[in-house]
């Protein structure tokens, strides 16, 4: 039942996720906030799990994979386009369009990722950063001379 799932999620966020969020990660988010940058998390992980994490970081906007719900319960299916690989770019463009923005007209963009799955998104931005990168992304970052940071 959804009520139990909600309780388990809250406990997981409190006991597991919150302690994993490092001071360095919070400081990085705050540095962008101080520059008045628009903060957005784009993740392939489902929004049900990631929204509370975005809330912990004080980030209002989140694009995640949405879960289908019927009568307040999850069906086990995805709703809409998953935000995975190229789907992240499509979802980002839709999010921007809803706000009257066009990606190519943005003056400066920062993308942080740990996964090779995000290489298309990183290549699209003006300031790609590999954060705790997997092996493939690390090699790509070195080849492209992208910054590599570690937040754990």
Model-derived features with residue positions:
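C-terminal cap/substrate-recognition subdomain and adjoining C-terminal extension
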Residues: 6-10, 14-152
